[in-house]
Amino acid sequence: MYPKYQIYKHAWVYKYAPHTEEALTPSDAQELLHKGGWLVRNTYGFDCAEQTPFWYVIKDTFGDLKELSTNTRNQVRHGLKNYTIRRISAEELLAQGYAVYCAATHAYKIATQTPTIEEFENRIRHASTDTEYWGAFNPNNELAAFAINEAGEDYCSYQTLKANPADLKKYVYYALIYEMNRYYLQERKLKYVLDGARSITEHSNIQPFLENKFHFRKAYCHLQIHYTWWLKWIITCLYPWRKFIPNHQIQSLLAMHGMQS
């Protein structure tokens, strides 16, 4: 059980495809917490029939341009005309990706800490062998948008999507996402692609965009959070006052607490 989880920002999270995660017992969770971390996030019952408060955003079918609305089809075509979409190497992303990352995060509605260039480069240099990179290039061969994906045996997680805000009006996201969907679902015939779990911070509109434009859907699941004793006490005390707490990190933690089922 322990090798299936890893610590990310003080939380134990599952390392593999969400459809393979199972419910943990309290003793399983405590075993992880004894090794470190502040909490264990456990999701199970992937794509259940019940409309729970928590979900993953996935796409498991691909119908070419025909499945899209007339407006979206035109936007995809414009994007493909304006940009060249292709798989790229880690070296290509290292060369041009950080400037795009900074421009994208500075445009978010909610203040988000941008990683340093050293953190950005270390992430790419130490990425797993399953990591795949995509880029959208303008006619001057400048990177306008990129994606960092984790491609497993039967699924692909779109882990990071960033675009230069100046290129959004030229439909760069439409072209990039359409081509990745086509590649993973039609060409490689994976079970599904996903854009992660329900957004807690809602600092970008990417998930509603994917649902409305590209027919991604909510794959509902159950969420259970197991805390260290002291964090559980803090959460219990603060939760009734969650609407009045200004700190965004604490707000996010309390919001996720309320999504359990």
Predicted regions and their residues:
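N-terminal accessory interaction module
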Residues: 1-45
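Active-site/acyl-donor-binding loops of N-acyltransferases
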Residues: 1-5, 45-65, 187-261
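A conserved beta-strand-loop-helix scaffold within acyl/acetyltransferase catalytic domains
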Residues: 1-8, 42-49, 61-169, 184
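Acidic-and-aromatic substrate-binding clefts and catalytic sites of carbohydrate-active enzymes
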Residues: 20-23, 93, 197-203
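Well-ordered, non-membrane alpha-helical segments in soluble/globular domains
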Residues: 22-29, 117-119, 173-179
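Aromatic (often tryptophan-rich) hydrophobic motifs at membrane interfaces
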Residues: 130-233
